[in-house]
Design a protein with these regions (language model features):
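Conserved catalytic alpha/beta core of Sir2/sirtuin-type deacylases, generalized to analogous enzyme cores
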Residues: 1-195
Length: 195
């Protein structure tokens, strides 16, 4: 439901939306967000790269269908292999101290985000659940011009004059934001808005 609310809000904005996420699970794509408007700064579990980095290739993990013994937490199926050298493949995600991560896909996504940001006249960042332990998302939102809505139940603090902080879970806050936008849209003389 939260993803749907975000998509509805994004579709109503003059320049649309762009997602910047440190999540590697592909949930924005699964929820129907345009993959050309997503930047996954730590990579994606749905893409693979060669473990020995024989090349700079990153490929979709669509053909890897893991069969897992959930009781023993063991992979039953074959490990994925590099289509170029036959060595083991790994998820294209950035781990701590990971000098072998190939960042080409994430760099291209970041370039797409940068291009979009240059075209946006009035930026609004909606940050949901980003914490200070791995502050990549927080730092980006704070560094950008424009206003921000920070939604975080435990770390909602936001710099002065930067925007609004909401000490709440993501779904609850998004429901309240959407309800407020709908109320504004229903007022006499309100600008035409999408629903």
């Amino acid at each position: 439901e939260g993803f749907n609310i975000l998509r509805r809000i994004g579709r109503c904005l003059p320049q649309g939306y762009f997602v910047f996420t440190s999540n590697v699970d592909g949930q924005f794509q699964k929820a129907g967000f345009d993959s050309a408007r997503i930047s996954e700064c730590h990579g994606s579990i749905h893409h693979l790269q060669c473990l020995s980095t024989c090349c700079d290739s990153i490929w979709p993990a669509d053909d890897f269908l893991p069969e897992v013994d959930t009781e023993k937490c063991l992979l039953r199926s074959e490990f994925p292999r590099c289509p170029y050298c036959g060595n083991l493949a790994r998820p294209n995600i950035l781990m701590f101290g990971d000098w072998g991560w190939l960042d080409g896909r994430s760099d291209q996504q970041q370039q797409n985000l940068d291009d979009w940001l240059r075209r946006v006249e009035r930026l609004l960042v909606i940050e949901i659940g980003a914490g200070s332990r791995i502050p990549t998302v927080r730092r980006l939102g704070e560094s950008l011009p424009g206003q921000m809505i920070r939604i975080n139940p435990t770390e909602p603090e936001l710099g002065r004059n930067k925007g609004v902080s909401i000490a709440s879970g993501g779904l609850e806050a998004l429901r309240r934001i959407e309800a407020a936008l709908n109320e504004l849209a229903a007022e006499p003389g309100a600008a035409e808005t999408c629903r």
